[in-house]
Regions:
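Multi-pass alpha-helical transmembrane bundle typical of ion/small-solute transporters
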Residues: 1-339
Length: 339
């Protein structure tokens, strides 16, 4: 029951969202809202773990700012405004025209958004791959979950800019199999921008006087750099959910409500992990989340060439985090037996 207090707002928002879905389209719409909420939560649970790794180093003021402003940006910015902006750029349309298209011609809106999938995947995949590699390619990292893999990766930390090199190679390798020179160039440019944005976000922590922790993560003392890093991370995680939602419905209000409910639950999980000290108690949970991020980055790149069901994407993340949790429990039992 103690954990339930972290989900009070999420449960309340869920009730409001289901009622809103029912008013918009009856029971079928309410059901789609529920399915989208589950989809978003499953796709972004690893995001909650990574959020917690940053938030636990931030002061209370910036934690509250992230949880308040961050949820507004996550729901209205990433799940509503961002897709509209993408369609506006793709179709060279103004804001009013795009909103009109989304509300009154949702099929065309969905088609235009989906047409930019390769660029969205390149940007998000590159950003998430850098997050994944920065954690594991660190010669100072001494805690390993999958030691046969993670231990050799730490040695790559001696190679200057190894993360950037591997990410660029992944972008180029993925683009080599794409049809059409224009599409390949769009993918490469978007991927490079994902790389640039990550470097800027990570570098902001150093500029503002951050302290480097295990896994190479910069933790800004002021909290602002951490706030921006988390928002960019949330944006990268939201891409798959926004695109995948159109497989269920083309109604923008229904999509926004469903994904918004999911985003609220992700924030609630984040709160619980931070204030219950879960990451400290389960030493491999963080590793599982970063492996899930690496898997999501790979799926985004592979998804350019073939359709990968969103259920599989969410399932693989849940399996990795679940396995890391089980390994943590096993480690705790062994450690307590030795003490």
């Amino acid at each position: 029951m103690q954990n339930l207090k972290y989900f009070t707002w999420s449960i309340g928002f869920t009730v409001i969202g289901l009622v809103g879905g029912y008013l918009l389209g009856g029971w079928p719409a309410a059901f789609i809202v529920a399915v989208l909420a589950v989809l978003e939560t499953s796709l972004s649970f690893d995001n909650a773990v990574v959020n917690a790794t940053v938030l636990r180093h931030m002061d209370e003021k910036w934690r509250q700012r992230f949880l308040l402003w961050g949820i507004l940006i996550a729901v209205f910015g990433m799940r509503i405004v961002f897709p509209l902006a993408i369609v506006g750029v793709v179709a060279s349309m103004g804001p009013v025209e795009v909103v009109d298209l989304a509300l009154f011609n949702p099929d065309e809106y969905a088609r235009l958004l989906t047409s930019a999938h390769h660029e969205i995947a390149a940007f998000g995949g590159a950003f998430l791959m850098m997050v994944f590699l920065k954690f594991f390619i660190d010669e100072n990292k001494d805690t390993h979950w999958l030691a046969p893999i993670e231990s050799p990766l730490t040695k790559l930390g001696r190679l200057e800019a190894a993360q950037i090199l591997l990410t660029l190679l992944a972008i180029l390798a993925t683009s080599a199999w794409m049809d059409g020179a224009d599409k390949r160039m769009e993918f490469i440019v978007a991927g490079v921008w994902g790389l640039i944005v990550y470097i800027m976000a990570d570098g902001l922590g150093a500029i503002m006087g951050g302290e480097e922790g295990e896994g190479g993560r910069m933790v800004a003392k002021t909290g602002f750099a951490g706030f921006m890093y988390l928002e960019l991370l949330d944006a990268s995680f939201s891409f798959d959910g926004v695109i995948g939602a159109f497989a269920l419905t083309t109604s923008l209000p229904i999509i926004a409500i469903g994904l918004g409910v999911g985003a609220m639950f992700v924030r609630s999980f984040t709160l619980m992990l931070v204030y219950r000290g879960t990451l400290e108690a389960y030493r491999y949970l963080e590793h599982g989340a970063f492996w899930a991020i690496g898997a999501l980055a790979a799926i985004m790149f592979i998804g350019v060439h073939m359709h990968i069901p969103e259920t599989f994407t969410g399932l693989i993340g849940a399996v990795l985090i679940g396995a890391a949790f089980w390994s943590s429990l096993r480690h705790n039992r062994i450690a307590s037996g030795e003490s």
